[in-house]
Amino acid sequence: MHDLWIFFLKKRAFTYMLMFALTTVGLYTLVAIPKESSPEVVIPIGVVSTTLRGAGAEDTEKLITNKIEDEVANLDNIDTVTSSSREGVSLVTAQFAASADIDQSIQDLKDAVDRAKGALPSDAGDPNVIKINFADQPVLIVSVSVDLPAGALGELSDDLKDEIKSIKGVSKVSVSGTREKEVQIVVKREALLNYGLRVEQIVGALASANASFPIGNITVSDINYPIKFAGSIDEASMLPDIEIVAQSGAPVRLRDIATVVDGLAVPTSFSRASVDGNPSTQAITLSVYKKSGGDVTKITSDVRQKLEDLKATSLAGAEVVVSFDRGELVAKDLRDLTRVGLETVLLVMLVLVLTIGWRESIVAALSIPLSFVIAFIGLYASGNTINFISLFSLILAIGILVDSGIVVTEAIHTRVRTHGSAEEAAKASIREYAWPLIAGTMTTVAVFAPLFFLSGIVGKFIASIPFTIIFVLFASIVVALGMVPLIAILFTREHKSRFEDIQEEYSERVKDWYKEFLGKMLDHRRTQNIFLSCMFGGFILALMLPVFGLVKVQFFPSGDQDFVYVQIERNEGTPLAITDLSARAVEEVLYDAPYVESFVTTVGESSGFSESGGGAGGKLANITVILKKERTLNSEEAMEDLRVRVRPILDAK
C-alpha cells in the first residue's frame, strides 16, 4: 500500500496531469450536473375522493369513508391508510410501502374502490383516485398583469404557454386566470317545433359536421345542454350553414332555427396581482414544471430570460411578478456552500499559519477543493443531483476531509528538520501515517454506512447523504496520501525566511505553553478530577437541553423564506364568486401588512404546494404573498401575524 502512494510521489508528471484532469472534469461536472431543491423520490401514495351532497361529516364517514377504507386496508404493500370526512366530502389516503411499484399500487387501489362502489349510496358521486407525486410541483410561478379584454388575455396566455414549453427541460405549463373560447347555440323553440326537430338531431348534425372547437351549450327555453366534440370545422362562422334534415325531409340550416354566439366559457378561475401595495389587477398565472432530471436553475433562468425578451414585444406594458422561483432557492444554497467552503479554507489556513507556517497552510487547504471536485465526479457518474441533501452532506464533510491533509502536511513539516530532504520527509510521513489515516477514515465511513440500509421513504430521501460523505472521505484519502505530499514538496523550503523563523518561534512558544499546561493537569489528581467533573457535567447538561425543550429537535428545520401561502377553502359547492369575496377580504388585510411587497391571488384553484396538490374548484383559492427583503419579521412570524389578521374576517377554512 505504501508503494502505491509513493508511486504518485515519484511519478510527478503523471500526478500533475492527474490533478489537472480531475480538476477539469470535476469543474465540468459541477456545471453539468442537474441541480434541484430535493431528491426525486417516488412516494407511492393514492388519494380517493368521493362526494355526497347534503351529507354531514358523520354521515359521510359512515356511508362512504369507512366502506372505502375497509377495502383499501386489505391491499398488499399498504403502509398506512388515513381518512378525513367533512360535509359532503370523503378523502381516503393510501400510502404504500416505499418499495412498491407506484403504477401497480394505484391500479390495485382503483380495483379496491370499484369493489366498494356497490356499498356506497346511489346518490354518491363516483370515487376519484388520484396518484400523488410530490416531485411534480412547479419550479417557477409567474403572474403577468396586463389590461386586456378576456379574449385577448386568453390568446396571450396561449402564446406564453407555447413559448415557455419550447424551452429545454420544461415538461408542462399550467395557466390560471383565463377563459376558454366557447360557442353557444341558442335554439328558437318555435322554429324547432315548426320544423319538427329535436335537440338530439342538432347535436347529431354538429357531430357529423366534425366541429373542432368547443361548443359549450345548446340552449332551449333557458335549459342548457352541454356538449363537446372535435373534428375538422375550425371556424364558428361555418356553423350557421350546417344542414339538418327536417321531419318533412327538407334540409334546414342551423341559422333558420338557432342563433350561434361565438364567445367565452364561464370562468373557472380568477387571477390577480398586486405590486408594491397597489390595488390588485387582473392577471394570468403560469406555473412551470420541469422534466425529471432537469436542471432547475437553468430551466428557471431560461424561462425568466424568455419573459424578459418578450417585454419588448407581446408583454410590452405588462407587469411580470415572479411569486416563486425554486431555481433561485437552489442557486442560493449553492452560493451558501461556496461561502462555507471558502470560510473553512480560510479558517484552516489561519490555524495552520499560527501553528506550522503559511506554506503548510496552503498545502493543507488545497485538499478541500481537490476532494470536492472528485466528489462532484462521483455524484455525476452515479446519477445523483445537486440538491439540499447532497449540499448538506458536502458541508458536513468539509470539517472531516481536511483532517487527513493537515496530518500529512504537519508530518512532512516536522520531518524536514530530521531528514533534510523534503522528498524523503514525504516518503517517511506516508509510511508512518498511511494506515492510521486509512483506519481513521474507515471508522468514519462505518458511522455513515448503515444509512444505506435505512428503509422506507426516509431511507430513499436521505440515500445521498452516506453516498456523498463516504465518497468525499475516500477522495480525501487519495488527495492526502497521493497529492498533498507532492504539493508539500513544492512549497517546502530547507532555508526559511526571517518571517518563517519568527513564525516557527511563535509556534514553539505555543507548544511549550500547552506542554506546561498538560503537565500540570496530569501531575495533580485534584486538577484532573475538577477537569473531568466539568467535562462530565457539561455532557449531562448537553443531554438535558433537548429533554427540557431548550433545544428543538426537527428532521429538517424550516428556514426564513421570501414568501408565504394563504390557502382558502370554503364549504363544498360554494360558487366561485363567493370564494372570490373571501379572497378579496384577505387582500384588504395584505394591503395593510407592512412586511408584504406583492401578492398573487388565484381563485378557483389551490396552490400546487398545498395538501390538495393543486386541486381546482369553486370553493378553493390561494394567495402567494411575496415578503419584503427588508423586514422585521421572519417568514414564520409573518405567517402567524397573517393568521391573526385574517381569522376575524373569514368563515372559510
Regions from the PLM with identified roles:
Residues 1-35, 433, 500-554:
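Signature of alpha-helical transmembrane segments and their immediate interfacial
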Residues 13, 20-56, 114-123, 380, ...:
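Transmembrane helices with small-residue packing motifs
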Residues 16, 23, 28-32, 63-80, ...:
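Surface-exposed amphipathic alpha-helical segments in non-transmembrane regions
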Residues 398-412, 433-453, 460-501, 623:
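Transmembrane alpha-helices and their membrane-interface boundaries in multi-pass membrane transporters
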